[in-house]
Amino acid sequence: MRMRLFPAIDLKEGKAVRLLQGRMEDATVYGEQPVEVARKFKEQGADSLHVVDLDGAFAGKPVNDAVILKLIQSSGLRVQVGGGIRTLERIEELLKLGVERVILGTVAVRNPELVEKAVQRFEEAVVIGIDAKDGLVAVQGWAEKTEIKALDLALRMKKVGVKHLVFTDISRDGMLQGPNIQSTVELARLSGLQVVASGGVSRLEDLRLLQEEANRGVSLEGAIVGKALYAGAFSLAEALRVVGQRSEGK
């Protein structure tokens, strides 16, 4: 299976930033204009975009909708959005903006019944985001660690009809140390869900390893790449070639 690559834009106060391990105080501004960042991704061959409304994640309410709408309209990319999405109304608002998929995180722990209703209503437009540290789920914009195992939550979500999952190892996010490939692959194998790997991709080799697992039949749907692109570790065009989304000559 050829993986989808999702270059990431994290929005804080309308700007494109990256955090270290989810800490708002450790935000680095990479682009005053997120729309320009998205256009550059598109020019390099992207067809998808991962957007996190960081203000929304911490405030629990929409903050950057105007920017999200602009990103969709100006880039033409297929956009998935996470951050502070905790009601059916909010999901509907985002889908009406033109968002392809919404990522539910905290609400999967706090209100699984809502997830079930969301899946019944919006089907595969609903993706669950599981953020974990040492195998345990974190919620509220990563500020609070629970005693729930990532796999247990994934299996619970599968029971209510969820098919897609974004898995982030918080300890790796923004650190450029490489993703926790073993945990990601294990979660995909044991849950049977389509898993998008997130957090820590730092080298093209990380993407090669993930793509090799996908080629072996592991249900790895894709990977989210953030800081490595902004830091210049590799280009998006190079990353797309590794997963076969772009030919060698392009």
Swiss-Prot record:
<dbReference type="GO" id="GO:0000162">
    <property type="term" value="P:L-tryptophan biosynthetic process"/>
</dbReference>
<comment type="similarity">
    <text>Belongs to the HisA/HisF family.</text>
</comment>
<feature type="active site" description="Proton acceptor">
    <location>
        <position position="10"/>
    </location>
</feature>
<keyword id="KW-0368">Histidine biosynthesis</keyword>
<dbReference type="InterPro" id="IPR006063">
    <property type="entry name" value="HisA_bact_arch"/>
</dbReference>
<feature type="active site" description="Proton donor">
    <location>
        <position position="131"/>
    </location>
</feature>
<dbReference type="GO" id="GO:0000105">
    <property type="term" value="P:L-histidine biosynthetic process"/>
</dbReference>
<comment type="pathway">
    <text>Amino-acid biosynthesis; L-histidine biosynthesis; L-histidine from 5-phospho-alpha-D-ribose 1-diphosphate: step 4/9.</text>
</comment>
<dbReference type="InterPro" id="IPR023016">
    <property type="entry name" value="Isoase_HisA-like_bact"/>
</dbReference>
<dbReference type="InterPro" id="IPR013785">
    <property type="entry name" value="Aldolase_TIM"/>
</dbReference>
<dbReference type="InterPro" id="IPR011060">
    <property type="entry name" value="RibuloseP-bd_barrel"/>
</dbReference>
<keyword id="KW-0413">Isomerase</keyword>
<dbReference type="GO" id="GO:0003949">
    <property type="term" value="F:1-(5-phosphoribosyl)-5-[(5-phosphoribosylamino)methylideneamino]imidazole-4-carboxamide isomerase activity"/>
</dbReference>
<dbReference type="InterPro" id="IPR044524">
    <property type="entry name" value="Isoase_HisA-like"/>
</dbReference>
<dbReference type="GO" id="GO:0005737">
    <property type="term" value="C:cytoplasm"/>
</dbReference>
<protein>
    <recommendedName>
        <fullName>1-(5-phosphoribosyl)-5-[(5-phosphoribosylamino)methylideneamino] imidazole-4-carboxamide isomerase</fullName>
        <ecNumber>5.3.1.16</ecNumber>
    </recommendedName>
</protein>
<dbReference type="InterPro" id="IPR006062">
    <property type="entry name" value="His_biosynth"/>
</dbReference>
<dbReference type="Pfam" id="PF00977">
    <property type="entry name" value="His_biosynth"/>
</dbReference>
<keyword id="KW-0963">Cytoplasm</keyword>
<keyword id="KW-0028">Amino-acid biosynthesis</keyword>
